[in-house]
Amino acid sequence: MTVIVSSVHADIYMYIDDNGVMHFTNAPTSNQHEYKVYLKERTSVSTRFHATDKYDKLISNASEEFNLDSRLLKAMIKAESDFDPRAISRKGAMGLMQIMPENFKMLNLENPFDPWQNIRAGAQYFKKLYKRFNGKLALSLAAYNAGPTAVDRYKNIPPYQETEEYVRRVLRYYRTFKQL
C-alpha cells in the first residue's frame, strides 16, 4: 500500500460580510473585516487510495437518509477531494464533497470542513439534482460539477473538459467500489 504525505502550511480565515455571506482566505488582505481563524494549520496530509473506509459510516448514514448508493457517494468523494476533508478547490468549493459557498445556506451547512456536515450536504444536493434530472446519473453528476443551469442549457453533459472528465472519473470509481 502506498502512502503519499504532503505538507500544508496555512490557516484558513473567515469573515461574514454585511449580507451574511461567508468569505474564506488563507491570507487576510484587509483590516476592514473581522477575520477569525476558521481552520488551524495542519502539518501533514496522508492520502491512500485503499484506505477509504475512514468515512464509511458517515457515507452510509447519508446514503440511507437520501436513498443513494453509498458506493456512488464514496466515488464522488474520491473524485472531488480524494478523501481530504480540508480540501479547497481553486474555485472555492470546500470539504470532502466540495460544496460551493453559495450552496451552504440552502443545505444548512455551517462548517464545510466537518466531514458529517459536508457529506450530508453533498448527498442532499446530489439527490436534489438526481430528482431534477429524472434519475439520469451522468446528467446529475455533470450538474453537481458544472451546475444545473449548464446541464439545462446544453440538455446534456456540458462540453466542458473538466465536467466530462469528472463524470468519467466518478463512474470509474463507482465501478471500482462496486467490485470491492
Regions from the PLM with identified roles:
Residues 5-7:
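N-terminal signal peptide c-region/cleavage motif recognized by signal peptidases
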Residues 10-12, 94-95:
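Short loop/turn microsegments at loop-to-beta-strand junctions
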Residues 12-27:
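Short N-terminal segments immediately surrounding and downstream of signal-peptide cleavage
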Residues 26-180:
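Catalytic glycan-binding domains that act on GlcNAc-containing polysaccharides
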